UniProtKB/Swiss-Prot annotation:
Any one GO molecular-function label of the UniProt entry: lipase inhibitor activity
Protein function: Acts in part as a hepatokine that is involved in regulation of lipid and glucose metabolism. Proposed to play a role in the trafficking of energy substrates to either storage or oxidative tissues in response to food intake. Has a stimulatory effect on plasma triglycerides (TG), which is achieved by suppressing plasma TG clearance via inhibition of LPL activity. Involved in angiogenesis. Binds to endothelial cells via integrin alpha-V/beta-3 (ITGAV:ITGB3), activates FAK, MAPK and Akt signaling pathways and induces cell adhesion and cell migration. Secreted from podocytes, may modulate properties of glomerular endothelial cells involving integrin alpha-V/beta-3 and Akt signaling. May increase the motility of podocytes. May induce actin filament rearrangements in podocytes implicating integrin alpha-V/beta-3 and Rac1 activation.
Gene for this chain: ANGPTL3
Domain Fibrinogen C-terminal: start-end pairs: 237-455
Compartmental location: Secreted; Cell projection, Lamellipodium
Pfam family, one: Fibrinogen_C
Disulfide bonding pattern of the chain: C246-C274, C394-C408
Keywords on record: Angiogenesis, Cell adhesion, Cell projection, Coiled coil, Disulfide bond, Glycoprotein, Heparin-binding, Lipid metabolism, Secreted, Signal
Region (Required for inhibition of LPL lipase activity): 32-56
Stated name of the protein: Angiopoietin-related protein 3
Signal peptide span: 1-16
Length: 460
């Protein structure tokens, strides 16, 4: 452009100068005939100007062509990005439709489960009432039979009485089987209801977070945990025949380890795992076997329980207190190290209520492993979000809630599960460990904490 402007400026000057020379010559000289061709100098100037103009135009064309190529490349990149974004938008819309369909199905299923749960509750209450009536009738018949036997000891039992007793026993067994079936179905419904609620919450969070702009990157989600103990509560069940403790269940003839419903005095009904050891029933309050359950939980979860009774779990401080306040109890701790060596120790103990932060006071009785828990001292329970005075960073340092004294010590059966066995001492201290004051440090693979009343007859 600059060259063109320069030529446009030079050419008029040359022409003007030439005209002036011609005029001056015309004035000073006699008229001469004009030449038919331009002067040689003028031709050279014009040729030089045109040459420069050509070079300038050539440079301009090359530069313009490069700019056009850059523009086309950017347009191609933009087209590809737009196409990719369109595909992602279509995929997101399809996923959203699928999520909405799934949400609708889950809502329908949830309503069905709710209706089934209400129906089962109604049936369960009616069955319990019928059982109470039948028990009263059986008791009345037994009293009549006793009177008949006492009044007529030498008279053989009447066939009708025998058949009546057999019929009543069969009815009672049938009702027991039916109640057990209803409780099993109730457990399954509770589990399904919890799973449906969890899926609904995930879908609700997904629908709330609908994208206002499309991003090509996504952030990973943090893993979730299941804080509260599943399959462990049945509320609003009113029946005096529910046992208060595992010993009662055992005394009624149930000699198999498993999950059972109990209702301690002045407490709600909940499920426990009754573990029969050498012909004696124990209530399992803690179990660690494989690290599948996170034990670095909050105070609320330690208070009411978490995990699964058929796996790793903590029964809950409030439930433990509701059991042990009924009588004097023994605490049994079973340990298994990574060499498959099994150890145990038993304590007589006292557990306070929530106002004392569930203070534990114990004395070792027997066992085949040295005691590692301070005796005759008030041990206060602490978690990372509920620390007792003097515990400072004990829950964080040991990755779980536990009973501590003034010092943290090196014992915590609710610590982090190290799998496989931790090599360094700091890692072993943060995990499941057991160490007496002057003894060796045991790195633990599995643990059980169980309780049993000292006076079993009081629960018959």
């Amino acid at each position: 452009m600059f060259t063109i402007k320069l030529l446009l400026f030079i050419v008029p000057l040359v022409i003007s100068s030439r005209i002036d020379q011609d005029n001056s010559s015309f004035d000073s000289l006699s008229p001469e005939p004009k030449s038919r061709f331009a002067m040689l100098d003028d031709v050279k100037i014009l040729a030089n100007g045109l040459l420069q103009l050509g070079h300038g135009l050539k440079d301009f064309v090359h530069k313009t062509k490069g700019q056009i190529n850059d523009i086309f490349q950017k347009l191609n990149i933009f087209d590809q990005s737009f196409y990719d974004l369109s595909l992602q938008t279509s995929e997101i819309k399809e996923e959203e439709k699928e999520l909405r369909r799934t949400t609708y199905k889950l809502q329908v299923k949830n309503e069905e489960v709710k209706n089934m749960s209400l129906e089962l509750n109604s049936k369960l209450e009616s069955l319990l009432e019928e059982k109470i009536l039948l028990q009263q009738k059986v008791k009345y018949l037994e009293e009549q039979l006793t009177n008949l036997i006492q009044n007529q000891p030498e008279t053989p039992e009447h066939p009708e009485v025998t058949s009546l007793k057999t019929f009543v026993e069969k009815q009672d067994n049938s009702i027991k089987d039916l109640l057990q079936t209803v409780e099993d179905q109730y457990k399954q419904l509770n589990q399904q209801h919890s799973q449906i609620k969890e899926i609904e919450n995930q879908l609700r969070r997904t629908s709330i977070q609908e994208p206002t702009e499309i991003s090509l990157s996504s952030k990973p989600r943090a893993p979730r945990t299941t804080p509260f103990l599943q399959l462990n509560e049945i509320r609003n069940v009113k029946h005096d025949g529910i046992p208060a403790e595992c010993t009662t269940i055992y005394n009624r003839g149930e000699h198999t380890s498993g999950m059972y419903a109990i209702r301690p005095s002045n407490s709600q009904v909940f499920h426990v795992y009754c573990d029969v050891i050498s012909g004696s029933p124990w209530t399992l309050i803690q179990h660690r076997i494989d690290g599948s359950q996170n034990f670095n939980e909050t105070w609320e979860n330690y208070k009411y329980g978490f995990g699964r009774l058929d796996g790793e779990f903590w029964l809950g401080l409030e439930k433990i207190y509701s059991i042990v306040k009924q009588s004097n109890y023994v605490l049994r701790i079973e340990l298994e190290d990574w060499k498959d060596n099994k150890h145990y120790i038993e304590y007589s103990f006292y557990l306070g209520n929530h106002e004392t932060n569930y203070t534990l006071h114990l004395v070792a009785i027997t066992g085949n492993v040295p005691n590692a828990i301070p005796e005759n001292k008030d041990l206060v329970f602490s978690t990372w979000d509920h620390k007792a005075k003097g515990h400072f960073n004990c829950p964080e340092g040991y990755s779980g809630g536990w009973w501590w004294h003034d010092e943290c010590g090196e014992n915590n059966l609710n610590g982090k599960y190290n799998k496989p066995r931790a090599k360094s001492k700091p890692e072993r201290r943060r995990g499941l460990s057991w160490k007496s004051q002057n003894g060796r440090l045991y790195s633990i693979k599995s643990t059980k904490m169980l309780i049993h009343p000292t006076d079993s007859e009081s629960f018959e």
